[in-house]
A protein has these predicted regions:
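Boundary of Sec targeting at the N-terminus
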Residues: 18-20
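Envelope-exposed proteins and targeting segments
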Residues: 24-26, 33, 57-59, 99, ...
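A short small-residue
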Residues: 25-29, 64-69
Length: 136
């Protein structure tokens, strides 16, 4: 299921994810009610991180986790935290220092996509990994 995200992402309107100037972002997607990251997504994330030269010197990393509204606010706050933690652990395994990783768990608040459709809910089940340039 998750391996099909690449095709789905091609269908998104340009600018669907508002991006700040100079930031670089990648999303890790999840099945409903899950914080499991499949091998395909792990490989995609690691490949993306490896493709960015001098990542540890040039960027700080922000993790922003999201959910769809199914299950209610309290459940989704927990699920969002678990999704953020799962991606955080992958970054630590990649030897990225804790000191440059910052987290925000939104839960079902602030969805980027409409939760009125299955597709929108599917796209809201994610953790955005955002690289912000370090300003000297």
């Amino acid at each position: 299921m998750i391996a099909r995200w690449s095709a789905i992402l091609l269908l998104l309107p340009i600018g669907a994810l508002a991006q700040q100037k100079d930031e670089i972002r990648k999303s890790v997607y999840f099945d409903g009610g899950s914080y499991y990251i499949d091998e395909y997504q792990v490989d995609e994330l690691y490949h993306w991180l490896d493709s960015i030269p001098n990542i540890l010197e040039k960027f700080e990393i922000q993790l922003i986790s999201h959910t769809d509204p199914i299950g209610g606010k309290q459940y989704n706050e927990w699920l969002s935290k678990m999704r953020g933690e799962a991606v955080y652990e992958l970054l630590l395994q990649k030897e990225i220092p804790e000191s440059i990783i910052h987290r925000k768990d939104w839960g079902l608040d602030n969805p980027v996509y409409s939760n009125d459709s299955y597709r929108g809910m599917m796209m809201n089940r994610r953790v955005d990994v955002i690289l912000h340039p370090v300003v000297f």
